[in-house]
């Protein structure tokens, strides 16, 4: 059984799934769209490196194996229709909603839940909404929150070794066959904000038309390769 989303194709078998990364890049709930040759392979390898790192930190991920150049072999998950965002600094939609200066530190990691729904612009919800709407139980939501914060702090530490700042990051979670909450989808410049001395190394380059996003994505991959080998 196959599924195709905006940036990935999922091929499901009995035991495993194959996540094939496309070269598409989107923004604004899919209203902005381009194809960048090579992006899929960059995001696939970046995801593989970072998920392997998180697994070593005790965080359950769906990664089984990276199959070059653009495919991940993963554990099949029943995905929650959610984006789980962890913010370390004020940026993006947080500033639009609440004000403040982009790049200001938040006192503690802030976790937000958004329903994946482009037509409704991914509405933000609380744990009570998740329960009432039948999306996730309170226990599942707490497990997602706990794993998301733990992963974010681990990745913050990873990038700080090269003096990069992780500002925020989006995760997606699902349930494995035993009902465990597991980190799925991807971890790449498509899903996090990464900065160094004011320079942008993430999808904001594309959102804001600030240059060649593929160049920045390649630099992030090279950074991950270098840090992973240390």
Curated annotation (Swiss-Prot):
Its EC number is 6.3.2.6. Transmembrane segments: none annotated. PANTHER family: MULTIFUNCTIONAL PROTEIN ADE2 (PTHR43599), SI:DKEY-6E2.2 (PTHR43599:SF3). Pfam families: SAICAR_synt (PF01259). The gene is purC. This is Phosphoribosylaminoimidazole-succinocarboxamide synthase. Keywords: ATP-binding, Ligase, Nucleotide-binding, Purine biosynthesis. Pathway: Purine metabolism; IMP biosynthesis via de novo pathway; 5-amino-1-(5-phospho-D-ribosyl)imidazole-4-carboxamide from 5-amino-1-(5-phospho-D-ribosyl)imidazole-4-carboxylate: step 1/2. The lineage of its organism: Bacteria, Thermotogati, Thermotogota, Thermotogae, Thermotogales. One of its GO terms (biological process) is cobalamin biosynthetic process. GO terms for molecular function: ATP binding; phosphoribosylaminoimidazolesuccinocarboxamide synthase activity. Belongs to the SAICAR synthetase family. It catalyses: 5-amino-1-(5-phospho-D-ribosyl)imidazole-4-carboxylate + L-aspartate + ATP = (2S)-2-[5-amino-1-(5-phospho-beta-D-ribosyl)imidazole-4-carboxamido]succinate + ADP + phosphate + 2 H(+). The keyword ATP-binding applies. InterPro entries: SAICAR_synt/ADE2_N, SAICAR_synt_PurC, SAICAR_synthetase, SAICAR_synthetase_CS.
């Amino acid at each position: 059984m196959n599924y195709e989303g905006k940036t990935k194709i999922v091929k499901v078998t009995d035991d495993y799934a194959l996540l094939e990364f496309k070269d598409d890049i989107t923004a604004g709930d899919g209203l902005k769209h381009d194809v960048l040759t090579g992006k899929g392979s960059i995001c696939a390898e970046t995801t593989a490196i970072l998920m392997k790192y998180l697994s070593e930190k005790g965080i359950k991920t769906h990664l089984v194996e990276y199959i070059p150049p653009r495919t991940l072999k993963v554990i099949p998950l029943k995905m929650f229709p959610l984006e789980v965002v962890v913010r370390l600094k004020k940026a993006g939609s947080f500033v639009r909603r609440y004000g403040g200066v982009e790049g200001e530190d938040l006192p503690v990691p802030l976790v937000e839940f958004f329903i994946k729904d482009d037509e409704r612009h991914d509405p933000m919800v609380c744990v009570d909404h998740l329960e009432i709407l039948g999306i996730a139980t309170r226990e599942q939501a707490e497990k997602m929150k706990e794993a998301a914060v733990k992963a974010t702090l681990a990745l913050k530490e990873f990038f700080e070794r090269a003096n990069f700042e992780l500002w925020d990051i989006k995760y997606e979670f699902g349930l494995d066959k035993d009902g465990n909450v597991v980190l799925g989808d991807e971890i790449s410049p498509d899903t996090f904000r990464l900065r160094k001395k004011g320079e942008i190394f993430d999808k904001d380059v594309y959102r804001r038309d600030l240059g060649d996003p593929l160049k920045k994505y390649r630099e992030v991959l090279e950074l991950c390769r270098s840090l992973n080998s240390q």
